[in-house]
Amino acid sequence: QAVPEFLKKVGDRPLYKEEGKDAYYMTVDGEYAVVPIAEGAWMLADIKRGNEPVASNKGASIWDLGDGVACLEIHTKMNSIDQDVVAMLQEAGKIDKKGFKALVIGNDSDNFSVGANVGLALFAANAAMWPVIENSISEGQNALMKLKYAPFPVLAAPAGMALGGGCEIVLAAAAVQAHAESYMGLVEVGVGVIPGFGGCKELVIRAMMNKKRPGGAMPALSGVFEAISTAKAA
């Protein structure tokens, strides 16, 4: 079988490459061309290419999107939430001090966030490190409350799974722009714990704000209890 002419032109070069702030693809002529970006569309990868984050640690980073808007990106395994992520959530709650006017929480990964790192929580529980667990929960609650009442707009842009703590991050945002393929829910009961970053009260608030809810408090709250107790995701 003869080798196609295109592959002869390619040789040992990659079909795609990145240089500086641009991404390139190889044309049928064997030359590189800049990957076009549709007007009004962007990916975080385009912002990150050739730039340095405003703030960063092992779990998350804050990027400058331009026009006074920052983006918080979680980049742990499966975008799970650990102490590094919580620390960067706290940092994101004061980005106005660095001149930013708005915050977007999102990433280019398949999943927004699968929630807390259960493995770390299990390790701490088995070691009876109760003060550590209590402090972790408190810091997570405080971080999300700062975002909820931030003096600037906070937009969550979930795609894929936003479960447990990931869902609670979305619930803390002032606005949500969700991908069509998004799956959200407070699923902590599935592993034997209850939502700890404020998601329970956020669901209650939304249930009570629903003008079409049944009369009285309990009928509306029963739906919230059912959703949490059955680890429902939608």
For each predicted feature, which ranges?
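N-terminal glycine-rich phosphate-binding loop for ADP-containing cofactors
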Residues: 1-110, 119-139, 145-152, 162, ...
